[in-house]
Amino acid sequence: NDKVLYHYLGFLFFNFKAQTPFRDIYTQWKALNSRDKFLKDIQHTIATRMLDRYLEETEKAAPDYQKCLKTMTEAISDFRENWYNNDKELYQILILLDIFRILDSKSIKKLPTDYFTRKSGQKDGEDKEHILSQTPRKDNGEITTIKTDWEKFVQSEDFKDIRSQMQDILNHSDAELTEQELIQLQNLLNSAGLNSIGNMALLDLRINRSYGNADYTHKRTIIFQEYMNQKYVRPHTLAVFMKGDIDAREATGIPLNRWTLEDIKRNTDKIAKEIGKNFNAWLTQNN
């Protein structure tokens, strides 16, 4: 019945099974005989497990986790960092963001046990989703190689800062783009933040495939309809598609029905600060 312990223990068990035998955790609980001390130990363990990947081999004997945390938050806050192929860490951070939202709310229900990791499976699994579409795609989900599709794509207001560079590539291309030209275009998009963690969310495959290569407004509508129809949508995913931080939105004047490069930068910065704040607290609270 302890909402906080449920979520942090669940995250630890499901994401670090090999390093976290249940017997060891139970022994730890009995030895401490204090809920608060036990929680602090669990949070500290989560932070160190996630930061271990930033340790050099020579640092493992005497790890400096604050140094690792600095490296981690810098990687998160750099909106040009490519997180798309960093699946394990990406999923863990996105799921922690779900947990933070749940624990900060009195109304959001507990995370179902099968959502402590990315759900796999062809029918009821999940996949990482670009909030702002990364590239123009065909109906089957493949990246289009048709020049006119790309020319239409780059006219979006979202790409105004890199439009001239993208258009320069397209001006020198034939009706069908070469592999090299596609790589050049994708590299430009990545430099603008399309593969940053601030443009990523975990979404049910069924929902993801239901709207194909739709724009943000259409994605937003479908996700909201699914949520209203009692389909489970992760709290962090719902928040970014519903743009829950209304106050910040009103202050910047960015419209609610678009997800812009400015949104990506803002979300990236928010995630870095949230992870940094929590991990720093977890690392120091036992000192």
Where are these regions (language model features)?
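Flexible coil/loop and intrinsically disordered segments
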Residues: N1-N287
